[in-house]
Amino acid sequence: PSVRRQRQMCIRDSVTLCWHWMAPTQTEGKRHFYTEKTDFNLKQALENPGSAEYQGLLHDIDLICAELQKLQEAGVPILWRPLHEASGGWFWWGASGPKAYQSLWSLMYDRMTNVHGLNNLIWVYNGQDPKWYVGDERCDIIGDDPYYTNGSRVAYYFDSANANRFKTCYKTSQNKMIAMTENDFLPNLNRMFQKNTKWLTFCTWCREFVCVMDESAGWGVTTPEYSGKYASADELRTVYQDERVVTLERLNGSGGYGYACAG
């Protein structure tokens, strides 16, 4: 959504933002966030601060900061989740390994915090591997995106609290809250509490994970109809109405939508 729309949506709430950063490559037709669709080499860019690629990193960060500044001026706190799912390698910011990723995170953190003075960002690390961790001093929350292979309900029923993924996050740092920053199936609240895997938040992804796709309207467009593939309308209501889940509506009476906190 546009910054104006974000401000309208979140004037009394918080918002979560994830940046699908198009690689600042100089090759025409190669600006993309998927590793396989770009020729951008993060390691080489970071090793050559005078290069067009490195300057491209700074340029893009500065552009994003200008937009985030508008939300700061509007008093909107942001759960800021950049450079997500890095250890998977499918995004260019994770394709050069953990050291390059950590350097890029530090560059972004320093520029946003110390150069642009952004203080409304709650930094969410989503590298999904303890070896990639950026350090307690440069993030506030640890996030994980537990998708089940091929949308398997069998796998979901086997570990519907995502306990193993939670434990991996805990190994990353014992000083941070742990959030389910993306998910397909809804977390099983009873299992969560039984296994003491109390995710701070969950965020069911869009598109077919909730609604039926509208193929005629373009990529990512959905109809108002629930798909039922990952969560039926009844399942959604059951989880969101559970007294153990704190929605924004319950938190401040705003009637807004967004993250649900399992407390």
Annotate each PLM feature.
Residues R12, T16-G50, Y54, A74, ...:
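Aromatic-lined carbohydrate-binding surfaces of glycoside hydrolases
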Residues L42-L79, L104-H116:
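An active-site-proximal structural segment forming one wall of the substrate-binding cleft
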